[in-house]
């Protein structure tokens, strides 16, 4: 296992996670580097999406779940009693598997979160909406139709809108749970290009079943199996010279 604590922004320390009596994650210790893309791979049910969701306390919304160990964000345990989960989720944003725009206008999809956090001045909101859509490489496609319902956008545009919506909250980290699995190849390529651009300013952690995608977009890769972190290393090493036989068997298609 490789740890890179000199530049880590998130660190998990001996994390165990339970759904009721079922243990979904066992003794997970990882460092996530700042301004890098980290991919989490493994077969269905291996715990990678569970780990992603506990990195910003999304699992708090599930009855009966329990976390042991520490999840440190900038050296603060996000599960400490004094930590505000709403603020945690603002700074560690999430993009889901299927595009989930609000049934509102394109403009209001981006402005909704900032309004809840105190943005009131129209000119400030307009500037924030434009900059967020620019970062998500969507501005040129929607700048003339901002009053239109977000539901009229294509699937790929909706997913970029959801990324822009997350960016409008000024996060430090962006979590992506299979963000292209519901998209066509052209839309997938656009999202991958966007991920490459966003890593200049954000830390990105992506769950993907697509091994080729993990190889293309990430600098680090963690392989999970049955709730355990089997191997964590530079992506190139994981895919060309893995240290664990289970990793090699998975990436060569022997199981999964």
From Swiss-Prot:
It comes from Syntrophus aciditrophicus (strain SB). Disulfide bonds: none annotated. ATP binds at residues 42-49. The lineage of its organism: Bacteria, Pseudomonadati, Thermodesulfobacteriota, Syntrophia, Syntrophales. Belongs to the ABC transporter superfamily. Phosphate importer (TC 3.A.1.7) family. Its EC number is 7.3.2.1. GO terms for biological process: phosphate ion transmembrane transport. It is a peripheral membrane protein. This is Phosphate import ATP-binding protein PstB. Pfam families: ABC_tran. Keywords: ATP-binding, Cell inner membrane, Cell membrane, Membrane, Nucleotide-binding, Phosphate transport, Translocase, Transport. The gene is pstB. Part of the ABC transporter complex PstSACB involved in phosphate import. Responsible for energy coupling to the transport system. It catalyses: phosphate(out) + ATP + H2O = ADP + 2 phosphate(in) + H(+). SMART domains: AAA. One of its GO terms (molecular function) is ATPase-coupled phosphate ion transmembrane transporter activity. It comes from the Bacteria. GO terms for cellular component: plasma membrane. The complex is composed of two ATP-binding proteins (PstB), two transmembrane proteins (PstC and PstA) and a solute-binding protein (PstS).
């Amino acid at each position: 296992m490789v740890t890179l604590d000199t530049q880590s922004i998130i660190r998990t320390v001996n994390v165990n996670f339970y759904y009721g009596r079922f243990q979904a994650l066992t003794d997970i210790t990882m460092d996530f580097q700042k301004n890098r893309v980290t991919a989490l791979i493994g077969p269905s049910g291996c715990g990678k999406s569970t780990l992603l969701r506990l990195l910003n306390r999304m699992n708090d919304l599930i009855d009966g779940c329990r976390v042991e160990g520490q999840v440190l964000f900038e050296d603060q345990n996000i599960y400490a009693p004094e930590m505000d989960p709403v603020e945690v989720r603002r700074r560690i944003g999430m993009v889901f598997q299927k595009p989930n725009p609000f049934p509102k206008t394109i403009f209001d999809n981006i402005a909704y979160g900032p309004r809840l956090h105190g943005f009131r001045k129209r000119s400030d909101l307009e500037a924030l909406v434009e900059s967020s859509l620019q970062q998500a490489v969507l501005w040129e496609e929607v700048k003339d139709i901002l009053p239109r319902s977000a539901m009229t956008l294509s699937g790929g545009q909706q997913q970029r809108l959801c990324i822009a919506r997350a960016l409008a909250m000024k996060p430090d980290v962006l979590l992506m749970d299979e963000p292209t699995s519901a998209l066509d190849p052209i839309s997938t390529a656009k999202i991958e290009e966007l991920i490459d651009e966003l890593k200049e300013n954000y830390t990105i952690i992506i769950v993907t079943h697509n091994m080729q995608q993990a190889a293309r977009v990430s600098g680090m890769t963690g392989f999970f199996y049955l709730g355990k972190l089997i191997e964590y290393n530079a992506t190139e090493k994981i895919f060309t010279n893995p240290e664990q036989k289970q990793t090699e068997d998975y990436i060569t298609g022997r199981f999964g």
